[in-house]
């Protein structure tokens, strides 16, 4: 068990407008590598925000300030034992080639509501994009700038130089 320190925002890296199911996420992450998966023991995210703004729980968790072993997800190497991970469906252009902020208005509203509610419940959280911890464009938007725009306190914004953006 470790202290919960971070909320890391991800995208599914799927083409703009293409919906994704939780079963697809589970397959992508937990199927063996020879069957097209990553071979992980568990999924990489706690929740997923669908195109219509619906937030679907993928891994249950409690609301305390700790990550129990059963709550760990595989969202960012080296950070999983102290982070919660949320993903929005999308993140690349319609051709599936370039990183793009494809969040629908409903997804933006849902993510904003989620972040604000959870920083109230977890005031110690620092919120980051996956790109802060891996050489990826994920979640395909500037998390720090967006957090400032929606009025998140500076103490809750992870500000270390990103790996990629």
Give the location of each predicted region.
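Basic/polar, cationic surfaces and motifs that engage anionic cell-wall
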Residues: 1-12, 16, 39, 52-55, ...
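Short Gly/aromatic-enriched secondary-structure transition segments
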Residues: 22-31
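Short coil-to-helix leader/linker segments, especially the first N-terminal amphipathic alpha-helix
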Residues: 24, 55-56, 66
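Extracellular protease catalytic domains of secreted zymogens
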Residues: 36
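Alpha-helical scaffolding within the catalytic cores
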Residues: 62-74
């Amino acid at each position: 068990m470790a202290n919960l320190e971070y909320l890391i925002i991800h995208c599914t890296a799927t083409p703009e407008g293409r919906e994704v199911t939780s079963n697809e996420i589970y397959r992508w992450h937990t199927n063996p590598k020879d069957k097209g998966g990553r071979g992980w023991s568990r999924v990489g995210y706690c929740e997923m925000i669908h195109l219509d703004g619906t937030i679907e729980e993928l891994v249950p968790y409690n609301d305390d300030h700790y990550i129990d072993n059963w709550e760990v997800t595989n969202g960012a190497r080296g950070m999983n034992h102290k982070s919660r991970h949320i993903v929005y469906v999308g993140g690349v252009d319609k051709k599936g080639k370039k990183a793009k902020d494809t969040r629908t208005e409903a997804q933006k509203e849902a993510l904003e509501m989620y972040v604000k509610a959870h920083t109230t419940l977890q005031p110690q959280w620092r919120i980051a994009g996956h790109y802060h911890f891996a050489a990826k464009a994920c979640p395909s938007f500037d998390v720090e700038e967006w957090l400032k725009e929606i009025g998140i306190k500076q103490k809750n914004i992870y500000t270390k130089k990103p790996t990629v953006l």
